[in-house]
Amino acid sequence: MTGQPTTGIRATAARTDRPPNDFTGLAKVVAASGLMHRRYGYYWTKLIGAVVVLAAAVAGFVLIGDTWWQLFTAAALAILFTQIAMLGHDAAHRQIFVSGRWNDWTSLILGNLLVGMSYGWWQHKHTRHHANPNKIGSDPDIELPVVSVTPDQVDRRARRYGPVLGWVMAHQGVFFYPILLLEGLSLHASSVRRVLSREPLRHRAVEGSFLAMRIGGYLALVFIVLSPGIAAVFLAVQLGIFGVYMGLSFAPNHKGMPLVPASVKLDFLRRQVLMSRNIRGNRLLDVAMGGLNYQIEHHLFPSMPRPHLRRASGMIKDYCQAHGVHYTETGLLESYRIVTRYINRVGLGERDPFQCPLLQQRAAV
């Protein structure tokens, strides 16, 4: 089934009967297919390749020296850091190794030491998202600090900030993309804030040490090699492109998809499939998006190795259609149009911007 713009739903009374567990049958089919088996050759190639390419990039940066041509290096590093972050995402989901400890340390090295993002902060936030995607009051990914993605957020912020921001919120879909230029800086700041906070953090000493080495060492290298003016622009370009790339990779996954009221309960299959959107494309897109374009498959089987997601998508799509579960997929550019249109309509105060198939799904549960 091709993707249609779908979003906010009206709260419905929770049914007392227990929802069916259609996921069990799918899990058996996927397990029998061997798609949950680890791909060590694939991941060791990517892990070693990431370290080699990063080392080459740093060496090239030093050799090129103090010149405005380094802005191209900044762009290349932004792309490389995003790809490494996506690899860390795989490790955090136990896709790379069977050993939880190996996955944890891989995530710490890739995330904290190489990219400058706290593994513990991301894991805490992302685990809650996976448990209840797009569920109001449960999913931290729909509680954005600037952009409103639910009508209640619009009402709350309008009362707090007054009518001055009315026009901005009405056009927030357009501002969403420029705001992503600040996302890279926000990710680093959130990571540092979590490490310095009193909230529980399993590897606080390691995370703090790795973050200090990465952020401090990176800034020192940039300002040693480059003059202050070029260094400042270099950092702005690198952080800006990093934030945009990260944002454009994650935004199509759930933005503009159904919002689940806090009172509504769904079985696992529908909770993951109905709130997720796949992005059609070739293998180049698979690499560019780090496998996030198979969001439905990833949410159903988070530990499935990335190279197996494409093969699993056809199997899971057929299963969903056979069980009457709406499976959404669309093109990349169309997904951005859907996201923009939805965020704008929420900003204008529309309570139910699109016809949502979740109501029909609820009737069948």
What are these regions (language model features)?
Residues T2-V29, F175-S186:
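Short, charged cytosolic
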Residues P5, G256, I338-V346, E350-V365:
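Conserved catalytic cores of large enzyme domains
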Residues A14-A50, L54:
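Low-complexity, highly charged intrinsically disordered N-terminal segments
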Residues A76-P200, P261-D352:
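Membrane-embedded catalytic scaffold of the fatty acid hydroxylase/desaturase
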Residues M1-G8, D22-L26, V146-Q153, R311-G314:
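Short, compositionally biased low-complexity segments
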Residues Q238-A251, K255-G256, I316-A322, H326:
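C-terminal, active-site-flanking charged/polar segments
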Residues G88, M213, P252-N253, E297:
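Single, functionally critical "micro-switch" positions that shape active/binding sites
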Residues Y40-I84, G111-G116, A170-L185, P200-F250:
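Alpha-helical bilayer-embedded segments of polytopic membrane proteins, i.e.
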